């Protein structure tokens, strides 16, 4: 449904639960758009950008993060500045940018005010541009902005439809249902192989010593175990 509605030209806001394959869906969509569509796919950080660049095969899609986009545009306009000032300088100078038919935002929940200002400028130069935003407010990682993201997205998208990705490929049905109660949203777990164990700090250290770093994701308190 997501790809069908997007190819129909609709502005879309996707509320995607954890492990629902939202980024994979965006990548499939980019490969499904006609080759004459000029697509700007903005990710929140560099790691997401590199992953998307490796998986999107269509040459009509520009994949970058916000700082990378600002850097490219400023360089093209012969404007130089330090990396920390990229977005600020972009918003102040408002350099000319390329034309795009489609704007795709990944992890929209982490958009900050300066990124919102950048997006408004991009939209002002591409008023007919289709906008697709995918994210999950319950997975908001960064909290260094006063921006009301839901209100911003509603205004920025204008007339749009809202879709929900509720199927979680990471969690079992029981764990997904429990997380859904905590977050007050529907999460349908389909990974019956998911196992959660409670371990002592010593057991955790011993377990991690036997694993490959690329296979491990650690979530914990800022102060450690």
Question: Where on the chain are the PLM-derived regions?
Answer:
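Conserved helicase motor core of SF1/SF2 NTP-dependent helicases
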Residues: 5-57, 61, 67-72, 102-225
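Short basic/glycine-enriched coil/helix segment immediately N-terminal to the Walker B
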Residues: 6, 82-101, 122-126
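Cytochrome P450 catalytic domain signature, combining two hallmark sequence patches
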Residues: 60, 80-83
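P-loop/Walker-type NTP enzyme "switch/lid" segment
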Residues: 73-79
């Amino acid at each position: 449904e997501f790809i069908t509605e997007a190819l129909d030209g609709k502005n879309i806001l996707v509320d995607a639960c954890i492990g629902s394959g939202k980024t994979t869906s965006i990548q499939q969509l980019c490969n499904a758009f006609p080759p004459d569509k000029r697509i700007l796919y903005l990710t929140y950080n560099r790691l997401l950008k590199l992953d998307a660049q490796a998986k999107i095969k269509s040459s009509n899609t520009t994949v970058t993060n916000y700082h990378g986009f600002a850097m490219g545009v400023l360089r093209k306009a012969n404007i130089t500045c330090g990396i920390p000032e990229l977005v600020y300088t972009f918003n102040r100078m408002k350099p000319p940018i390329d034309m795009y038919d489609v704007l795709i935002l990944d992890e929209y929940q982490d958009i900050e005010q300066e990124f919102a200002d950048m997006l408004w400028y991009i939209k002002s130069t591409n008023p007919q541009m289709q906008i697709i935003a995918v994210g999950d407010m319950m997975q908001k990682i960064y909290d260094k902005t006063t921006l009301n993201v839901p209100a911003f997205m509603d205004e920025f998208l204008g007339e749009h439809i809202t879709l929900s990705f509720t199927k979680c490929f990471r969690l079992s049905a029981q764990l997904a249902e429990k997380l859904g109660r905590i977050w007050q949203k529907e999460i349908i777990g389909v990974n019956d192989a998911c196992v959660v164990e409670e371990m002592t700090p010593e057991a955790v250290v011993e377990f991690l010593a036997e694993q490959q770093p690329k296979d491990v994701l650690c979530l914990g308190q800022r102060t450690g175990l």
